[in-house]
UniProtKB/Swiss-Prot annotation:
One of the primary rRNA binding proteins. Required for association of the 30S and 50S subunits to form the 70S ribosome, for tRNA binding and peptide bond formation. It has been suggested to have peptidyltransferase activity; this is somewhat controversial. Makes several contacts with the 16S rRNA in the 70S ribosome. The keyword Cell cycle does not apply. It holds the Pfam family Ribosomal_L2_C. The keyword Glycosyltransferase does not apply. Belongs to the universal ribosomal protein uL2 family. Keywords: Ribonucleoprotein, Ribosomal protein, RNA-binding, rRNA-binding. This is Large ribosomal subunit protein uL2. Part of the 50S ribosomal subunit. Forms a bridge to the 30S subunit in the 70S ribosome. The lineage of its organism: Bacteria, Pseudomonadati, Pseudomonadota, Gammaproteobacteria, Pseudomonadales.
């Protein structure tokens, strides 16, 4: 994997920084694991905008990724590593010994030809999936379940990882990349290693149009709007908004805590930094 800075042959190329991975599959994805992905433009079934800054972009297919890793004891060979437009991480196409193929989040260091396996007796090796109670303390993991059998919900983006720091009774304690310490049921599964494509954060799209290709529309500042559109709008000349930063609906933003899920507060040993 290499970081490539483009030569400034035009204004749109001047600030482009690419991450080039020669191991990525250059052909079409595996068709039986594709699904149609419709565009919403950020609207709900009433036609109202529920998520701003969404619209346009290149057509995409959704890749059906296996987050459960529940084919226990059946070895699989990594056929290839692929690009996935729906996530920052790369995905790996596995071919199991019984002939079935599945996509998984590609772990760092795993390449075509490697053998992976799931289950309580799986070797301690990057890419293998085990219950947290069977993983040694100090191990780096990703793709962590919050409920046994539901599938991975934590630590799925490019370069992400968590560390298993303690085991007590039916729970284990994980240190997440944010600094949060969280308890998770020891029966939940996780995948060893960290997520691939850790250089993703170093890339630069270089121009506004590249953002539009991804289906992301411009973000207008509140102070550039009229008072009818935003609490920071209006004023004579250029103003700073005159109040602490808020959303278009008046809720504090930029650092205000928004967590309200008291039901799982007892699972958090230490809040994130």
């Amino acid at each position: 994997m290499a970081i490539v800075k483009c030569k400034p042959t035009s204004a749109g190329r001047r600030f482009v920084v690419k991450v080039v991975n020669q191991e990525l599959h250059k052909g079409a994805p595996y068709a039986p694991l594709l699904e149609k992905k419709s565009k919403t433009g950020g609207r709900n079934n009433n036609g109202r905008i529920t998520t701003r800054h969404i619209g346009g972009g290149h057509k995409q297919h959704y890749r059906l990724v296996d987050f459960r890793r529940n084919k226990d004891g059946i070895p699989a060979i990594v056929e290839r590593i692929e690009y996935d437009p729906n996530r920052t991480a790369h995905i790996a196409l596995l071919k199991y010994a019984d002939g079935e193929r599945r996509y998984i989040i590609a772990p760092k260091g795993v390449s075509a030809g490697d053998q992976l396996v799931s289950g309580i007796n799986a070797p301690i090796k990057a890419g293998n999936s085990l219950p947290l109670r069977n993983i040694p303390l100090g191990s780096t993991v990703h793709g962590i379940e919050l409920k046994p059998g539901k599938g991975a919900q934590l630590v799925r983006s490019a370069g992400a990882s968590a560390q298993l720091v303690a085991r007590e009774g039916s729970y284990v304690t994980l240190r997440l990349r944010s600094g949060e310490m969280r308890k998770v049921l020891a029966e939940c599964r996780a995948t060893l290693g960290e997520v691939s494509n850790s250089e993703h954060s170093l890339r630069s799209l270089g121009k506004a149009g590249a953002k539009r290709w991804k289906g992301i529309r411009p973000t207008v500042r509140g102070v550039a709007m009229n008072p009818v559109d935003h609490p920071h709008g209006g004023g004579e000349g250029r103003t700073s908004g005159g109040r602490h930063p808020v959303s278009p609906w008046g809720f504090p933003t930029k650092g205000a805590k928004t967590r309200t899920n008291k039901r799982t507060d007892n699972m958090i040993v230490r809040r994130r930094k």
